Amino acid sequence: MAQFLRLCIWLLALGSCLLATVQADCSQDCAKCSYRLVRPGDINFLACTLECEGQLPSFKIWETCKDLLQVSKPEFPWDNIDMYKDSSKQDESHLLAKKYGGFMKRYGGFMKKMDELYPVEPEEEANGGEILAKRYGGFMKKDADEGDTLANSSDLLKELLGTGDNRAKDSHQQESTNNDEDSTSKRYGGFMRGLKRSPQLEDEAKELQKRYGGFMRRVGRPEWWMDYQKRYGGFLKRFAESLPSDEEGESYSKEVPEMEKRYGGFMRF
């Protein structure tokens, strides 16, 4: 007896679930018919739903609606919503891949994952640069003290994640073009500039030369140098003789070329 009651309860629960599913499908189909008709009043929505569910003896309205659905099924906009979304996502990914080359293949999934884990709140949009810097841990950040560099990385990340503004990007591109030379000189201290430099940058270059000039410079010759000479015969002998000795260092420093003076022995072997 207990098993029979349990079976009846399960049948009632299953029947109610199936009934709810059928009712939802019937309501959706009747709504499509009303949308497709030029005059929605031609079909009674309630009668169509009841006939679809089998609660009315007549099936005239439901048969008409079913024929209409079979004829005009591909024309309903909500049937192709998923297809439109997929095509739009593919177009956006194609444009980003075309614009940034292989950058999105390497880091696109990383930034999208971080954007899903840490969504930006509306009140935090004003400080977008700081939030992006905290979120990505300095990713794409060259110099934390430069506002232009941080703004550049912020705009790039916003554009890749779909949160940028076109007008803001256009205005910022104009400003970054005007300040490109200043940011380059600040970042590299005249490294990428030509021979003509301002006195202030010249003084900064001299200070850097005094501080880091001989940092990478070798003192004397390493022990493995003789091993290379023995192994390769006299192949490296000419290059070894061209290097100045410790005694000739002072006289050699007076004759170094302009490149050596500028970078303070940084490029010297």
Swiss-Prot record:
Disulfide bonds join 26-48, 30-52, 33-65. The modification Phosphoserine is found at residue 253. It comes from the Eukaryota. One of its GO terms (biological process) is locomotory exploration behavior. Keywords: Cleavage on pair of basic residues, Cytoplasmic vesicle, Disulfide bond, Endorphin, Neuropeptide, Opioid peptide, Phosphoprotein, Secreted, Signal. One of its GO terms (cellular component) is axon. The record marks 111-113, 133-134, 216-218, 220-221 as: Cleavage. The gene is Penk. It comes from Rattus norvegicus (Rat). The keyword Secreted applies. Its main location: secreted. GO terms for molecular function: opioid peptide activity; receptor ligand activity. Expressed in brain, heart and testis. Proenkephalin-A is cleaved by CTSL to generate Met-enkephalin. It is found in: Secreted; Cytoplasmic vesicle, Secretory vesicle, Chromaffin granule lumen. Residues 165-191 are annotated as: Disordered. Residues 198-209, 219-229 form a propeptide. Residues 1-24 form the signal peptide. The keyword Phosphoprotein applies. Belongs to the opioid neuropeptide precursor family. InterPro entries: Opioid_neupept, Proenkphlin_A. This is Proenkephalin-A.
